[in-house]
Curated annotation (Swiss-Prot):
EC number(s) on file: 1.1.1.290
Name of the protein in question: Erythronate-4-phosphate dehydrogenase
Native organism: Shewanella woodyi (strain ATCC 51908 / MS32)
GO cellular component terms given for this protein: cytoplasm
Protein's UniProt keywords contain NAD: yes
Subunit comment: Homodimer.
Annotated residues for binding of NAD(+): D147, D232, G257
Pathway the protein takes part in: Cofactor biosynthesis; pyridoxine 5'-phosphate biosynthesis; pyridoxine 5'-phosphate from D-erythrose 4-phosphate: step 2/5
A Pfam family it matches: 2-Hacid_dh
Family: Belongs to the D-isomer specific 2-hydroxyacid dehydrogenase family. PdxB subfamily.
Amino acid sequence: MKIIADENMPYVQELFGDLGIIETVNGRSLTAEMVKDADVLLVRSVTQVDASLLSKNSQLTFVGSATIGTDHIDTEYLTQRQISFSNAPGCNATAVGEFAFIAMLELANRFGTSLKDKVVGIVGAGNTGSAVARCLQAYGVEVLLHDPLIEKSDPRNFVSLDELITRANVISLHVPITKSGEHKTWYLFDESRLNSLNADTWLLNCCRGEVVDNRALINVKQQRADIKVVLDVWEGEPNPMRELIPYVEFATPHIAGYSLEGKARGTYMLYQKLMQVLGKKEEKEMLALLPSFWTEQLTLTKEPSEKALLQLSRFVYDLRDDDALFRATLLEDPSKKAPVNSSNNNGFDLMRKNHKHRREFSALTLATTGQSEVDWLLNLGYSGVGR
């Protein structure tokens, strides 16, 4: 069996090595010729899997995408070809949720305010949006949800987008990209909607770059410095508008979901599905893949303040590091930029490929004196806290 896998997908050798010959490739430059003799194809969101890519292959049995979304996969075509397909919904939801929560803590610290006093509107209440909500609700922050696709079948309370924008002073975006239809998300936040944001609103985009009109965002930010922005995703990736970067408080290269746990979970979910397709018993465990955290545990002597919670979060992931690297790579240091016309696209893809794979809150064990008032840290995701 020949397995072709994206070179940036972790633990492929550990999980699939016993099943056949593995060839790793650059997902952006994959061609029909390169996959013509593949039995299994493992990709990420940077690879379009369609009739064109598979035109020379007559033996493919399984396509796996270590992603939440499937907009890069022609699933109808795979069904016609009777090629099994699986993605990994929710694999990085915890990572995205914690990323957004940490970004909000960083904004609160930078601008001398309290996250706990904010009203956070979450646009898109699927896996990642719900993960953000869990973090915020564990900390005691008021959360508003907007998701017209699931509100009729979901018992949670939802509000309209207009109401959310009116009431919220933090907005976090977690929707798939949809270019047409009643609930189109392409340029969901256009210039008009951006201008309608409350004074001092924080806007975070951790889903798809084109959900926010980036050119319009520049125009609005030039007039409204009160709006604070966190962008992990960019219109036109992997070539973001460099002129937008100075207007963004925290800028990262589409790595919100890049926790070690999340990336391992995505690959592992594909391993589980392929074993089902092959009719084989699973022989690998995901937790066995993960290294030990750098410290066994930290001891809390009292309930942490918001500043202490930020410091605790920085033990697991310091967002400032990725922000500084992003700016240095795309704006400042020519030595960090890839050659013109290279597949690394001036460093954006290179940053993703070389990301240090942060850990999730669960990797850090907290010891306490047993006080029940820190139980909320367990709900936030840390291990070993509370009663």
